[in-house]
Every structure is written in C-alpha cells, then in structure tokens.
C-alpha cells in the first residue's frame, strides 16, 4: 500500500521533511493540497492525502451536486495563488452520486468534463500525482481515529453520542454488549476454523485471505481450482462442502463488523 486517504481532522501535527520543529494542525488545519509522508511504528512509511473537508461536506450534504458547473467552479476556485503543485480533491460515499442525490452521477460527469474542456485543471488520480510530486512534508496522525466519527472509533464499540438529531431520545448503549458479543463469537469461530481447517487446507488463514477469489467468481471451475490449490490435493465431496462452510463462516465473521450495522 503506497498511500491512503484520511479526513483532515485525523492529523495531529506536521513539518517539512528534514526540519526539527513540528506544527500543530489538529482540528482540520492541515493543508489538503499536497501529499504527506507518515512514518509508521514498523519503520515503513506511507503517503497520506487529507481530503478537502468543506467541499466534500458540501458535495455530500450542501447541494453542490445540483449543478455540475457550480461544482467545477468550486473545485477550480479552491487552488491557491501559488506556483507549486497543488491537488484539490474530495472524498464522499459512492452512493452520494445518484442514490442520495438524484442525477448526482451526471453532475459529477459534467463537472469533470467542464474542468478539462475549459482548461481549468488537470484531472488526475492519487497514484499519478504521488509519482510526479512525492511528499515534501511529513505528519503524525491522531491514533485510533476515523473519518466519520469525531469520537475516534467509538461508533463501533460504545455509546459515542453521534446522531442525526432526528430522534433526540435515542442512545447507543447497545453497542458495547453487542461488540463484546461479536468479539467473543469471532474468537470462538476462529478456534473452530483453525481446528477444522487444518485437515483441509495447507494454510487455513492463507486460504481465508485468498477466498476473495471465490467471492468474486463463484463459478464451479474457479471453486474447484481454488480448493485444489489451497488443499494441495483433491477434496472429496463431503470435504468440499465442509471447506466452503468454514470459509463462509469466516467471511460472515468479518461481515458482522460492517460499519452500517453500528450506526
């Protein structure tokens, strides 16, 4: 993984690479127009892009998708009057374009075409931009944070208090016991999977990780090929059923943590 995308409130401090003094940029004060280097505890590094919070919010909730031209003008107008390379970028849920906002996908398409046809900006992707303009600054992020919850990762484990305001009397006290139950079940299933899977797979956990290949293509030919590779031998019909049940069990053990269920 070369890079990731975070919210502007997920960074704590920043400095130019090579300098000693850090600058506090907590609370969303980071400049989102450049990539940053983040040094990991493992000794490795990763590049981070912090998306433009105000524009992203207006796209998702402020009606900016009502006009593709207005959206293009907002993006193009956000470049600073500097000669150095700059990236103006946003991050929103995919369902924003068409599901939350009818014809939002058309507005986005018009916006991108307008930017290019009018010569207002070059449309790029993170990988290309990072290759051309590597980080000149480094950051330290806020540990245990998330883009969607100001309480860190509280949304997935406790009564963090996030709500839409539609039901002021509601609370999320149910999250803590549900999370504890999910964690207990996950551990119980992991023990079963490892015990039952060692007689079917060369490496049960590698098979679990590689199972994405079957999820993406459930044709009989692909399933047979996958199981033969992971088992190192031809499985009987009964063993095939058992192997697939174990893999599906592990898949659902991960699905129970899907964020939608914790809102």
Predicted regions, residues:
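Structural recognition of the beta-strand scaffold that forms the well-ordered cores
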Residues: 4-5, 89
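Short, acidic/turn-prone active-site loops that include or flank metal/cofactor-
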Residues: 7-11
